[in-house]
Amino acid sequence: MLFISITAALLLAVLDTLPAGGVRAQDAEGWYKAHPGMARISQVNQDTHQIVDEFGRTRFFHGTNVVMKEPPWYRPFEWAPGVSSFGEQDVQNLHALGLNIVRLGHSWAGAEPVRGQYNQTLLDIMKKQTKLAEEYGLYVLVDVHQDVLARQFCGHGVPDVSRMRGPVGTAATDMAVQWFVKEDWVPGWKMYPFPLKLTPFPVDNKGFPSPQSLCGTVDWSLSYTSAAVCNAFGRLYNNYDGLGDAFAAYWKKLASEYVETTNVVGYNLLNEPWVGDSMADPTLLVPGVADHKVLEGLWNRAAKQIRTVDNDTLIWFEGATIDILSGFNNVPLGDGSTSVHSFHYYSPPQLSSISTTLNNRRKDNERLRTAGVLTELTFWMGDDQQMQGLADAMSATDANMVSWIGWAYENLYNGTSGQPYPELAKHYSRAYPAAVAGTPNSFSFDENSGTFKLQFTSDPNIKAPTEIILPPSTFPNGYKVQVSPAGSLLQYGPNKRTLALFTSSSIKNTINISVTVSPR
């Protein structure tokens, strides 16, 4: 067994002792100088069901969600306590926590206020925030977010008002044209939120419930069962009035904006899509049915448009909102090597433990020959039971080698002090392997002892290093590293939070390697 301090590691990083021939330089610093940017990620290993980067390393992600659900549809750049922002201070904070991914909401409502005309100003702002994330080592998952689809339903997601009718100074000036949700789609008595309430909400000239406070009288998650919401989702999936085509065209626009962006790890097609018009077809409520019956068609429609401008970026797809069982027959366009199953865990609607859910998702990955990532889970302050559930989720994702993205960034902070809640920060600041130069067999982090363990099978053809994220807040006094077999890995510290481990050039065949990192 080999015990080496991080100080000694900086020296050993450039030395590789061979059985014969003395010492040969293995220039870790030179490798990082030759590869100064973030590694491009655009492939899934269909045998291991894990995401891999351009160097062949298996990649893991810990991160958070950043989504703006109302105008102006993006988080402000300026940092202020109690304000949900996403600027330089925020990405610095996320980097310091040890995170390496952000699921960044790209509102369709904000991006296409007039049908067929895109708000380039908003898209440029989103690209600026994506670039800012790259400067601090954060990947971005481009996410088209929705909750209950539209503001006409007390939600958000699809475009609502495209323009005002009539000349200025006339009554018609205040009439809005709605290019997605139309008032005549359902009879007046079935308008939102029927049947949650027997009397539909009054609406303003834009078709939004008025006063807005009415929205608080209905459980938003139950709004998916309202007649108007079901009808609208059904029309999207059936491509009524070309709405499915418009959705796909928006994705083509986004892909054309990001095709050359190194830190974009994928395109998340739509957040938590509802099953469709379950009032017209009740079988859609059976877990798994909507996935193959209505969602596969929309995902293929969008994926085809994406691939006209971007052949490489991973396409992330979700199952229906209830997300209990996966019912997909195939991944978008049938290529699991360029697709990722994006799934969530909340209880309810999940009925089983997080461990059972992750095991079921593993079976989905094997069946669909793709990878899966937990892109939302409960990551906010709560009672003892909820906090224990979060701790259990952290252990379970490690045990199943699953990447995760918590919901949501703004929940991390105390709104009064602007300081992170320690109970949440400790989970965000876990040690984990961001990149593994081979096939990972297991990894774990014990928050009580601060000990991280990794076992993997090396791949001597991969010259890039294994990278372990060790947040300074978790290891304030440094750390010690134990490697077996001795001499199999050479250490280097490219930055304050990363331990790089280069496989020794003396190793010509695959071997099993174990790494243990513990605090000083």
List the model feature ranges, each with a label.
Residues A20, D27, G37, D160, ...:
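Generic low-complexity segments that are intrinsically disordered, proline-rich and/or Lys/Arg-biased
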Residues A25-R57:
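N-terminal module-boundary/linker segments of secreted carbohydrate-active enzymes
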Residues T17, G22, A28, T510-I513:
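Short linear motifs in intrinsically disordered/low-complexity regions
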Residues G37, F55-T58, D90, N238-S256, ...:
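Substrate-binding clefts and catalytic carboxylate motifs of secreted carbohydrate-active enzymes
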Residues D47-F61, V66-L314, G319-G327:
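Active-site mouth of glycoside hydrolases
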Residues M1-R24:
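Fungal secretory targeting signals
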Residues T516-S518:
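Beta-strand-rich extracellular modules
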